[in-house]
Amino acid sequence: RGELVLSFDRSVTYGKLIKKVCDINEVGYDIKVPRQLGKNMCVPYGATLNGALVPNTVTKSLHTEKTFTPSLMDFDFRKFPNYMDIRNQIKVLSSFRKPVILIDDILHKGHRIKALDPLFREADIEIKQIVVAILSGQGKELMDIQERDVEYIYFLPNLKNWFNENSLYPFMGGDYVYREGSSDEYILPSINFILPYASPGFVRNTDPENIYTLSETCIKNAIRIFET
């Protein structure tokens, strides 16, 4: 018995997410002149659509970053460098006085939404809908527990592992690591969870040889990209 490997193109999922948000907000896909805005606002809270504008929809990104401790054994969610702290960002969202449509690329373990949910409730912000590109069975259970309504592009009931290709390639992306006393606000300390930098601890129940193969492939791909 084997495993099914699926690849998702970000540009395709972006287009489908934007259409779904427009449908929920009951607005057209083309920008109207003069502007005719929907009654809900769109809030990307991860990397997906961050900094983008949804047609005919008030769009305001929530700038958060998954941040690992120096030991790489734990992480939490903090403001992205050079932005206000998350609580103040949410207060800004509250000032619009509009129901919110939250957007992210995937809802699986739900660490980010679990960290943000108490802050949204504290600010008394109405979450009209959560929209994700990919929803797993575990993510759906979490939304049932939080009594949140979630829409998705793709539903994967049995998702084993999720890889963000960009974060695995050295010098091209990575996961943010908090460093005490770091003075450069424009170069973020980061780590790629591949060997020899760090072991991908989220990959379990597999032959160690597979970890070496994954790491080697990522490094070779990064080299090829830099050479082109």
Residue ranges and their predicted role:
Residues 1-228:
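PRPP-associated nucleotide enzymes
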